[in-house]
Amino acid sequence: MLRTHSLGELNASLIGQTVTVTGWVARRRDHGGVAFVDLRDASGFAQVVVRDEADFDPLRNEWVLQVTGTVERRPEGNENPNLPSGEIELIAETVTVLNTAAALPFQVDEHVEVGEEARLRHRYLDLRRPQPSRIMRLRSEVNRTARELLHGEGFVEVETPTLTRSTPEGARDFLVPARLAPGSWYALPQSPQLFKQLLQVGGIEKYYQIARCYRDEDFRADRQPEFTQLDIEASFVEQDDVIALGEKIVKALWALVGVDVPTPIRRMTYAEAMEKYGSDKPDLRFGLELTDLTEYFKDTPFRVFQNEYVGAVVMPGGASQARRTLDAWQEWAKQRGAKGLAYVLIQEDGELTGPVSKNISEEEKAGLAAAVGANPGDCVFFAAGKPKESRALLGAARVEIGRRCGLFTDAGDGVAAKDADWAFVWVVDAPMFEPAADAVASGDVAVGAGAWTAVHHAFTSPKPEFADTFDADPGSALAYAYDIVCNGNEIGGGSIRIHRRDVQERVFEVMGLSPEEANEKFGFLLEGFKYGAPPHGGIAFGWDRVVALLAGTDSIREVIAFPKTGGGFDPLTGAPAPITAQQRKEAGVDAQPEPKQAEAEPEA
């Protein structure tokens, strides 16, 4: 071994002992013939005293050293209570340089602000900094905790293929050419969905996996083309069983950061979430529910409010906002595809001012504050139009109001997780289908060519009361699905699955997949359902998002060892990169698949 102790192990119990340690030079300070070196390794820091000028003179930051010396107590008054090794120092007897370091592109110091591009380009240096290092270790603990819990529940960890066939699942596939089958392609899995269902057909009964998933999506903020999920599936379960297991996992994970999550966690229907919060992932750390004013303004003279839906959200104290701030709200709304954000200001004397107040009737003005629950000094924002789009705008405004008014406290930026606000909710009874045009408009890929596509995925079972009617009335059918939301972030989603071939074929038909197309894409699943598939269901947690919340960081890039940028580019390796003409030829990128040979007739 190159060392006898890690730096984090050095403490007063070792005073008088000779030890050998290794690490990087974090900082050096010269004091007239003696140098103090702050040495860093993965476990922490320790102060090394080097008295030989020949040893300390050449040392520079991030050089890699091996130091042998004696542990001594620091002189009185020089202790550092912020370090586990703060009572002692290591008096160096020998200093060996294991490697030198070139001039650094940025300082390996958590107190120095560094641009994300530089940090990702030199991620190996960034990971030496305390916070990224802590996050990697937290992620390891999260993995270990989940594995131990699921093992205790009788689950089996099974690895599913990462080279499979392309199956439409709601996003675009990453495709891999098959060199030995020119013109044919593998796809990287968007999720282990089909394989974990087939494991239930295979009698595994309780499966889990910390799975890598791949989706070739359009550039979106804080999305990664490859991501991780904790994937779980079990046979002979109902919704309550999966939810109970999910709550055990959440409780165990948040306990790692000192947060006790009360269970059972509240449940809310999708319809209630959209009506009250304008989102299927509501942030319940604060109130400010939306108010439906459609009936209130049914006879309004204001043409803008003569619409299918009119709603409002209150900003406490918002009447004191400057005009430029109110104008900025309009730009904020336009960035979200709206024409603007109508408002009224309720003055301290109760008078209504602002653009909307000039266009509504005196009777409407008189009762408005009471209708929306506003007080003098508040601002009321409105949206009118299609219910889905209008509620979404108000829901986003609600969260922005909560942030600007300080109605909740996030972890991070000096706030420990145990001191932050946390609110969890299960959102249940979501629609089974949505118009395919809506899915495409939001950046997803419709699975079939029909007018409808699945909200969750094509393998989600309808709720029992819709089992016989979902194909006749797709817009009314509810899914046997459940999503868990934390502080406005969806951290997991699951459903009871379809386990009967006839039901699965009916779902494919609603989505516009012909029997031939369904058999071509999903024939292996439909075939499996012929042989006694058990009732089953599961859940998948977005592992990167879970770790980001626990770590108190806004970006999932911070919790991935080597992340891509928002555009899918890797500054470290330069991926994606062109391939050579030879590679292109060998991979068969431009090859056409050979026609399938007709199967030979069986002999009589």
Swiss-Prot record:
One GO term (biological process): aspartyl-tRNA aminoacylation
EC annotation from Swiss-Prot or TrEMBL: 6.1.1.23
Binding positions for L-aspartate per the UniProt entry: 169, 215, 456, 497
Region (Disordered): 571-604
UniProt-recorded Gene Ontology molecular function terms: aspartate-tRNA ligase activity; aspartate-tRNA(Asn) ligase activity; ATP binding; nucleic acid binding
Coiled-coil stretches: none
Renumbered residue ranges of the record's region Aspartate: 193-196
Site positions for Important for tRNA non-discrimination: 31, 77
Sites where the protein binds ATP: 215-217, 224, 490, 542-545
The protein's name: Aspartate--tRNA(Asp/Asn) ligase
Taxonomic lineage from the root: Bacteria, Bacillati, Actinomycetota, Actinomycetes, Micrococcales
